[in-house]
Amino acid sequence: MSVRANIDHQQWESDFFGLSTAKLDFAAQQAEIILESQLDDYAIVQAKISAGDIERLDGLSQLGFSLVEGEVDFALTIGTENAYLNSGLLVTERVDIAVADEIPVLRQAAEQVFSQSRFRAPWYCDGDSGRFYALWIEKAVLGTFDHTCLLVKEASGAILGFVSLRHLDDDTARIGLLAVMPGANGRGIGRKLMSAAWVWCKQHQKRQLNVATQISNVAALNLYSRSGAAVASTAYWLYRGQHDSI
């Protein structure tokens, strides 16, 4: 079973991880049948497909791709009343926009919280996932990737959690990272972060907020469902690495 796609070299990821990385582009108009010899030029080749695309999944499996992780993308409508999020924040807590001085503590938290992701062994080295997300949250605070980072804090100023947000268009925003600080679990901080993101969207006249998470992250799946978000799509991430036996 053949697979048609373009092989797009991922320069930034190649440099960051020190691994020659490519990603298959199935939407390319000039897509050609992929040969195993072409894939051998890269340490890692990534593919993201719709979870319902069984034919393409079978074709990728024959090329030596392995399932890495499933992904669920949610969409939350902003214009409707939302009692769950409207009552999420307490008067003893506040929401601030993260500033550069807070980057070190946020990097440390992100490196710890996001240690398990699709950037995992055996394709990536231990610590690579944490390094990636630490840089992500730094860029979110600086506004060079996501556009802002909101912090839920105690009245004392201690950070309880963070959520980064990106403008997609006039009507739509997307959550990049959402995490509770280590040691602050079990206090409903995830709900408070979703409340902060929801308020931010209302303030910026957004009509929809998108957020994706791993299928294995049951806590996040439950949080987004309780927040009123609906499943918009599901997908699989697959990798082919030079370590794989084909």
Language-model regions, residue ranges each:
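Conserved active-site alpha-helix within GNAT-family acetyltransferase domains
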Residues: 52-67, 187, 191, 203, ...
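Conserved acetyl-CoA-binding loop-helix of GNAT-fold acetyltransferases
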Residues: 29-38, 177-182, 186-203, 222-226
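A conserved beta-turn-beta hairpin within the catalytic core of GNAT-like acetyltransferases
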Residues: 8-25, 68-71, 147, 167-176, ...
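A conserved beta-strand-loop-helix scaffold within acyl/acetyltransferase catalytic domains
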Residues: 117-135, 139-155, 159-173, 178-180
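Acyl-donor-binding surface of acyltransferase catalytic domains
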Residues: 26-101, 235-240
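A short, internal acetyl-CoA/4′-phosphopantetheine-binding micro-motif in the GNAT/acyltransferase core
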Residues: 19-30, 50, 178-186, 213-214
